[in-house]
Amino acid sequence: MKEKRSSFVRLWGYLKAYRYAVIFATLLKILSVVMSVIEPYILGLAITELTANLTDMARGVAGAQINVGYVGWVMVVYLFRGVLYELGSYYSNYFMANAVQSMIEDMRNDLSKKINRIPVSYFDQHQFGDLLGRFTSDVETVSNALQQSFLQIVNAIFTLSLVIAMVLYLNLTLGLIVIASIPITFFGAQLIMKKSQPYFKEQADVLGALNGFVQENLSGFNVLKLYVREESSQEEFRDITRRLQQVGFKANFISGLMMPVLNAISDLTYLLVAVIGAIQVLAGRLTVGNMQAFVQYVWQINQPIQNLSQLAGTLQSAKSSLDRVFQVLDEPDEVLGKNESLDTELTGQVSFNHVDFQYVEDKPLIRDFNLEVNPGEMVAIVGPTGAGKTTLINLLMRFYDVTKGAITVDGHDIRDLSRQDYRKQFGMVLQDAWLYEGTIKENLRFGNLEATDEEIVSAAKAANVDHFIRTLPGGYNMEMNQESSNISLGQKQLLTIARALLADPKILILDEATSSVDTRLELLIQKAMKNLMKGRTSFVIAHRLSTIQEADKILVLKEGQIIEQGNHESLLVAKGFYYDLYMSQFSKKEEVAK
């Protein structure tokens, strides 16, 4: 098996499209580093000139005077250096940010395209929150790390290199002292980071647990109150926050040692430089200006070492996030099959021919399943949890492919058809009525973008939802969102029925469409359903058997097998599983009525 490339190597594949901006940002950062490093040296020139001549003037040396022109020239150079430093710093960040944000946009677009191509089975195997995190926080972690770390690495490498060159140029003895402090400083910083890293990781884990606990308790707040679990919930919350406080303290205490340790090493280096430098100044082997330059270089050398040490954790976090992003991008696409287009509209003739299916190898769920459905028929599917009801629909929609056998629609093996053309023949009304942010009109038009306003109103009337829409502020132009509290679940289901009517599909999937609504809305939904199912092949999954009594065929499933089949009356006469289920629900209604 070919070994996968490093995540950072693959990241360059995204960034190289903006390589000129990156190169320009790097050059500007190098310019700012050069301007920063030469600052002590330029100041040293002015200080040397001033101190030397002031000393001679104080001694009364004949002709001693300050070369004002030279000092003025040095100050002009110093100010010009400052302007170049600021411009280099600002525009290096500007161009790097532009390149990184453009790259991140490309990465998110690739993720979005990938999500539309991967099979539905991926979503069954991964939590929604985890996938959302890969789109948002993981990509953002990569963005922040790259934007900050890249220029910090450039800054650290060139600062260290130039400072080493400058101290060796100014004075070999003092230069060697400064250079000797570098590995000591780096080792100290690395040791502290290594000790604190496990606590920071644990802190992140505990913080994640705290977020999950809060989210869980807020979403189940009513249940929490109902069972009087506030005190135990509060105690658990205190335990988590206590752990967070403990690991947070340890992480910050150890990492807080960074600056004292680095400052101690700097102080020691400074002391050696000051003592030996003073001796050399008195001996005339070192100027006062160069002496002050050395002092500044001692302080200047600490920051890049500290940055490089801290970047290790940042880059590790970025790599973890990159790995998670590329895990999604590396997922195999849906198998396209022969991708034949549909030249004619389907009539809705559906056949399951000796179909086998299994989610997990050697654990068959559906075995030798056979079914013939004529155009326009209503087929109801009932059975206990895990019987295979939803799996049948997933196979029909080709969210999964059959293990053996074939499913045909109008004689076409669905594996040979274009998924896009094939799925356009379907309409769905689910218990969890999905509506996206936008106007009601935009939501209804979702399945038929060419629909006119008149067609939208006609579909809404057929779905018994037109009157309700007109009572809303803005009517058909009212903005919908996840917090649309003035629209009940049943009303949302009516809207999805109108949407399905407008799409005019040949085959319908109705999954628990009338569960969890009041009686009045259930009647409206049932009437809307009848309008929707006219002339269309319909597959209905429902627990409330009162909604499927008019079905042409009722399939009773158990462990992926049809154990009973017929219409409502014939299945009651047979007094099998369906009869027991129906009588159980009927008896419950009788008890409630009493």
Positions of PLM-derived features:
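Alpha-helical segments in transporter systems
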Residues: 20-45, 74, 78, 93-97, ...
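Transmembrane helix-loop-helix hairpins at lipid-water interfaces of multipass membrane proteins
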Residues: 22-88, 169-173, 284-288
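Transmembrane helices of ABC transporter permease
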Residues: 17, 21-34, 148-202, 273-286, ...
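An intracellular "coupling" helix at the cytosolic face of ABC transporter transmembrane type-1 domains
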Residues: 16-20, 120-121, 139-146, 150, ...
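ABC-type nucleotide-binding domain
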Residues: 64, 337, 343-594
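Cytosolic ends of transmembrane helices, especially the final helix of ABC transmembrane type-1 domains
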Residues: 229, 253, 270, 294, ...
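A short amphipathic helical element positioned immediately N-terminal to and/or at the very start
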Residues: 4-19, 131
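Short intracellular "coupling" helices and adjacent cytoplasmic loop segments at the cytosolic face
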Residues: 1-2, 101, 109-133, 137-139, ...
